[in-house]
Amino acid sequence: MSKKVNNRTTEYPIDDIFLKRYSPRAMSGEKVSEKELMTLFEAARWAPSSSNIQPWRFIYAMRDTQEFENLFSLLIQFNKDWCVRASVLVVTISKKTTDSGRENATHSFSAGSAWQNLALQASEMNLIAHGMSGFDYEMARKKLGVPDDYTVEMMIAIGKHGKIEDLPESLRPRETPSDRKPLKEIVFKGKFPA
């Protein structure tokens, strides 16, 4: 039995939390409080992690600060056009090694789990958390002093919902929940298809 929420239809019934979450860009510029932000990071903290290594780290900056301007400067122009109304910018990084110095092959995967928890919590709190890859990774590493044994993974724009009219006209048609590939394209029994 399928389910429809937010103009998204599932092939099997799942909890609404997964269908409600999407990545809008229209933000109001209104401040997200420190308490709201720490609640998002608390959700991220409880993500599953291989061997409980918890390799994720977050560097954040609040709007109207020099730190925010530093993070904003890392973005490509496309993302600057809509992130101008974000309340918080976050750089997600992950530690490539364990505490004993061994390689952690799943550090990026674990950081992705933490990001997913943060995104779901934001959706539950009626906040936007929009993940981005469009930024200067090497400049982020330099500006933020990220050590060599860490990988810069992604950036996140966090904010309160705004008006679609405040977005550049070219982005307005994209301000809707997107669909997903059917299960038959992503799930294979026994081995990868030929």
Per-range role (PLM):
Residues M1-A194:
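Acidic, surface-exposed loops and disordered segments
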